[in-house]
Amino acid sequence: MTAERGPRSPGTGQKLRLRATEPMPQWTAKNLHALLDLPAAMELRQIELIYRAEGNANLVLALPQFKKVLRLPKMISSRLRQAAHQRHELADEVARPEGQRVSSERAGTENAGDLTMPDFMAYIGIMRRLLGNEFVCGADIVAIPKEDDRFWINEHIRAQRPVSRLDKEFVGPFGLLLPDVTQLPATFDVLLANLQAKGTTGDESGAAAGVGDGGGVGRGAGTRTKNRSAVRRLGDTYAIEIKPKQGWLQLASDVNDLFDLMPSGAVTKPKETTCNQEENEPSARDKCWCRFCSMQLLKMHNGKIKRLGHYCPLDLFSGTPSRMLDALDALLACPQNNLRVFQNSNLIYGDHANSISFDELSSRVFPGEIMVLIKHLLVACLLREYEHPESKRAEGSNQSQKQQQEQPEPEQLNQSRVSIAATETKAGAAGIGAANVVLPLGGRAAAPVVTAGQSSTRTRAAAATATTQRYTKVARVETTITRQAATSMAAGPASSSQLSGNVLATATATATATAMATSGRTETKTEPETPAEAASTTSRNVNQNESQKLNRNEPANQTQAQNNKTEIFRLPKNCVLQKILNLQLLVKVSQPIKLLPKLLSLCPFGFVYSACPPENLGNCR
């Protein structure tokens, strides 16, 4: 491929060669009649279309009979543009030929549709490779070529649309047809109908309705109608949509001098603080920023929202069940546009005009403990692993067995004891969770010297506590890892004769210290030391004592700056939150954060609370 590059534009030659060897897949557009198996004589207005939602670029319409949704791109139509700018463009409209104007607009619309839909399909393919097939639904390109059908769609949903969104319409001629995730798939209806036919559900009427002979088209349709009514008697279908927002932090020091972007008219009045407060409070440039909590106050000031919510994306992406439950409580109490609840594919709770109140949601829809059950179910779904961990454990055990077979017998015995102790302590620390692993000031974990019996008792108790956890085990990883906490307990006994009796205690204490420092994956192994290694260990202890004395004399601001670095909470590798977080970081981490000068004028010192409690947003001055 490199030999065929052009001398003038090598990049272009390579790009053309890649397109020739790896052509983009061709997607063909089909009409609704072909995709939904409708009669050719049926018109579009005979199909039930329900307005679902819309954003800045797309309209979403539901087809409840087919459990599908239409995603239609929207733009400012020529009719609305002419109505808004009729006076200003009157001279241009008279001078320009009418036929030329209409043909150019039609060509531009068709070109936009031809280019947009394949781009959407390619984007969906990329999302499938990044997130997985279990999180991304397939789509089909649907063609709506008739202008009368597009006009009817716009007029049919105009009354349900927000007034602020009426400046854009669906001008076609293409859209996307996707599954409606607010309803159970059609395979579930077939499964429930079969269960009712066998009498498994205990609904005799449903069983009788599902047995029909099915002779003829009319009888088959009647049987399906009876089955659907019987399925509905089993209960309602609820769907909860969450828009999590940005779930990662950005240090103020990584932003391009936010305080230099402050408007010249903004005057800051520093708060009077004592010397002790200045030492205890970290610098604003070293604290973490939460973009969502920052933008909430700006929206409140501009009148886009009526009240501040208590939701913070950091709680939802923390991986800690208690914090995730707090985030769900905040979303349910003040959903704004970040949470919506559907009942049988109908939107019943959200920020729309006809939404029910939170009291009605908690008393009528999800009364009593059902609301608690729903929130715990959401947390379990968000933290669910979409792989089988048993296979990985089996592979890891096979590899460890092969390594142990190759080692000598005495070393193998000591190594097995060390690995057992390290595994117990690591499982205990990971099971307790990040909220229960607290590091002292400076990020240094002080590991006490314990005996083998005490360490074994504590680690087994921690492991027993870990088994009572309801959700997936979560551990917290500090970005600043101090070497002293990890190496202070690595020094073995100076005498080689005492090593055989204390190897288990030393390994357990070492693993405990490392787990407290990193709260996660770091594994430590202790092997029998020679006299030369013992001497080197003694010299390392002396150097560590000297370094500790030097560290005590370090400025307090450096130690505090290390504590205020961003913390990354470890989520399960293949859960949906981790997938979303990876995608957010992939898109945004390489781009500088742009905050409006208006935001800085509202709050000169910035929103610098690492947890971003909403009640503190107004007190940041």
Swiss-Prot record:
GO cellular component term, pick one: nucleus
Domain of life: Eukaryota
One biological process term in Gene Ontology: inositol phosphate biosynthetic process
Segments of skewed composition (Polar residues): 540-565
Positions of short motif EXKPK motif: 241-245
Class of this enzyme: transferase
InterPro entries, alphabetized: Ins_P5_2-kin, IP5_2-K_N_lobe
Segments of skewed composition (Gly residues): 209-221
Catalytic activity: 1D-myo-inositol 1,3,4,5,6-pentakisphosphate + ATP = 1D-myo-inositol hexakisphosphate + ADP + H(+)
Domain comment as written in the entry: The EXKPK motif is conserved in inositol-pentakisphosphate 2-kinases of both family 1 and 2.
Biased composition (Low complexity): 397-416, 529-539
UniProt function note: Contributes to the formation of Ins(1,2,3,4,5,6)P6 (InsP6, IP6 or phytate). Phosphorylates Ins(1,3,4,5,6)P5 at position 2 to form InsP6. Together with Ipk2, they are the main contributors to higher InsP synthesis.
Molecular-function GO terms, alphabetical: ATP binding; inositol-1,3,4,5,6-pentakisphosphate 2-kinase activity
Keywords noted in UniProt: ATP-binding, Kinase, Nucleotide-binding, Transferase
Gene3D superfamilies: Inositol-pentakisphosphate 2-kinase, N-lobe
Family: Belongs to the IPK1 type 2 family.
Region called Disordered, residue ranges: 1-20, 87-111, 201-226, 391-416, 514-565
Segments of skewed composition (Basic and acidic residues): 87-108
This enzyme's EC code(s): 2.7.1.158
Pfam family, one: Ins_P5_2-kin
Name this protein carries in UniProt: Inositol-pentakisphosphate 2-kinase
